[in-house]
C-alpha cells in the first residue's frame, strides 16, 4: 500500500497500480514521488499518461528505484532506462530545464501542463512527439543545441503554449505535422532551411501569428504552396474554442529576396482560392512584381479588413485605402474591443476625415484610452470659440 508523509510531502508507491487509489488531497499536496516498483509497464504511453492524469501540480521530483527495469530519473525528470526517451517532467518544476544528452525522443505528453519557462534540447534529440509541450503556458524559450539532429515534430507539440512568441527550429527538421502551434502565442516564425522539409496544413491554428518567413533557397527548391498553405486556417477556424481576440485575421508573408505580402488567414476553397494562389505565384515569379491586393480574397469581412490594413501599411495602395475608408466604422469598434494598441494601428494611419475622427474619439473615450484620446484631439480641426469670433 502507498505511504504519504505530510511533513515532507513525499508520496511512496510500492506498485504502479497504487496510483489509482490516491485521494485528491494527496494529489494536491505531494511534492515528491518515490516509486519502488521494479517493473516496467507494457507501454511507456501508459506510464506517462498515468503520471500526467494524477494532476499533481506541486510535484517537483520523481525518484524511481535503481532496480526498475524500464525507467530512471535525472534531476527529478523521468527517462527510459537507456536514456533515449524523456518520458515525464513533474508539473512543479519551474524555470530552465536541460534535457539529458543522448535523449532521442521527447515523448508524448512528457511536458503537458508543465510550468517550465525555458528548455535546452541537446543535439541528440531526433523527434518531439505529439502534445509533448501541450498547455505549458509559462514556456517562453526553446533552445536547440548546435548540430541538432531533430528531424520530426508531431502534431500539437506546442499546443496552448501561450507565452511562446517565437521559436527557431534547426535546419535539420524534415517533417512538421499539422497544428504544431495550435492555440499557442506564436507571433513570428521562420521555416527551417531544408530541401526535404514537408509541412502539413494549419500550422498556426488560432495563433496570433503576425509574420512568417521563408528562406529564398528553400522557396526556389519547393515552390510557394508548401509554405503558404500551412499559414492559412481551415474553414473551421471560426468554431475553435479560443479567445477570438488572440486570433489574427491577416499576416505578413515574407520570402527572402521578395517584397512581403499581406495575406488573409482564411481563403474560401474553389475558384476564389485558385485566383488567390495564381496571384501569389505570379508575384513570386518576378522579383520586381507589384504586390497584389490579396485582401479581396479573404473568407469573410474580418479577414478582408485586416489584410487591407496590412496591405496599406506596407504599400499604401489606393485599393486598400478605399477598403479601409469603407469599413472604418466597424473596424474602429472591433479594434477597440481588442486593445488600445490594436485601435492605434488603425487610428495612426492618418487618412481620416473629421467625421471619422469624431467617431474614433467617441470610441476611445468609451474605452478610456487616454493616449488615443490625446492623439485624436490633436488631429481634429480646431474649433473657434464664440469669444474669438469678431463681430
Region annotations inferred by a language model:
Residues 345-346, 376:
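Conserved hydrophobic site in ankyrin repeats
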Residues 368-391:
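Charge-dense, extended regions
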Amino acid at each position: 500500500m502507498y505511504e504519504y508523509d505530510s511533513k515532507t510531502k513525499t508520496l511512496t508507491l510500492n506498485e504502479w497500480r497504487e496510483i489509482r487509489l490516491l485521494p485528491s488531497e494527496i494529489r494536491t499536496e505531494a511534492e515528491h514521488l518515490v516509486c519502488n516498483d521494479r517493473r516496467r509497464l507494457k507501454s511507456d504511453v501508459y506510464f506517462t499518461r498515468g503520471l500526467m492524469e494524477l494532476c499533481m501540480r506541486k510535484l517537483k521530483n520523481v525518484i524511481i528505484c535503481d532496480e526498475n527495469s524500464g525507467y530512471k530519473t535525472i534531476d527529478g525528470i523521468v527517462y527510459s532506462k537507456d536514456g533515449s526517451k524523456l518520458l515525464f517532467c513533474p508539473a512543479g518544476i519551474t524555470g530552465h530545464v536541460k534535457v539529458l544528452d543522448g535523449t532521442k525522443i521527447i515523448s508524448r505528453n512528457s511536458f503537458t501542463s508543465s510550468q517550465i519557462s525555458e528548455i535546452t534540447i541537446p543535439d541528440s534529440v531526433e523527434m518531439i512527439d505529439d502534445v509533448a509541450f501541450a498547455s505549458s503556458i509559462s514556456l517562453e524559450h526553446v533552445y536547440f543545441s548546435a548540430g541538432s539532429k531533430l528531424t520530426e515534430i508531431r502534431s500539437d507539440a506546442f499546443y496552448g503554449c501561450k507565452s511562446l512568441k517565437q521559436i527557431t527550429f534547426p535546419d535539420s527538421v524534415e517533417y512538421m505535422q499539422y497544428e504544431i502551434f495550435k492555440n499557442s502565442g506564436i507571433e513570428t516564425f521562420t521555416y527551417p532551411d531544408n530541401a526535404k522539409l514537408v509541412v502539413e496544413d494549419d500550422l498556426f491554428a488560432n495563433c496570433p501569428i503576425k509574420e512568417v518567413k521563408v528562406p529564398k533557397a528553400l522557396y526556389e527548391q519547393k515552390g510557394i504552396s508548401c509554405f503558404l498553405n500551412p499559414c492559412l486556417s481551415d474553414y473551421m477556424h471560426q468554431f475553435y474554442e479560443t479567445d477570438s481576440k488572440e486570433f489574427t485575421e491577416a499576416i505578413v508573408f515574407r520570402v527572402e529576396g521578395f517584397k512581403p505580402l499581406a495575406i488573409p488567414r482564411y481563403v474560401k476553397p474553389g475558384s476564389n482560392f485558385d485566383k488567390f494562389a495564381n496571384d501569389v505565384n505570379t508575384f513570386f515569379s518576378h522579383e520586381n512584381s507589384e504586390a497584389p491586393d490579396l485582401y479581396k480574397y479573404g473568407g469573410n469581412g474580418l479577414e478582408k479588413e485586416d489584410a487591407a490594413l496590412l496591405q496599406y501599411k506596407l504599400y499604401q495602395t489606393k485599393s486598400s485605402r478605399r477598403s479601409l475608408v469603407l469599413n472604418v466604422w466597424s473596424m474602429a469598434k472591433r479594434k477597440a474591443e481588442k486593445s488600445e494598441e490594436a485601435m492605434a494601428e488603425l487610428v495612426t494611419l492618418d487618412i481620416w476625415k473629421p467625421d471619422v475622427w469624431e467617431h474614433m474619439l467617441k470610441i476611445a473615450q468609451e474605452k478610456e484610452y487616454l493616449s488615443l484620446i490625446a492623439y485624436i484631439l490633436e488631429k481634429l480641426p480646431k474649433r473657434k470659440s464664440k469669444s474669438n469670433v469678431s463681430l
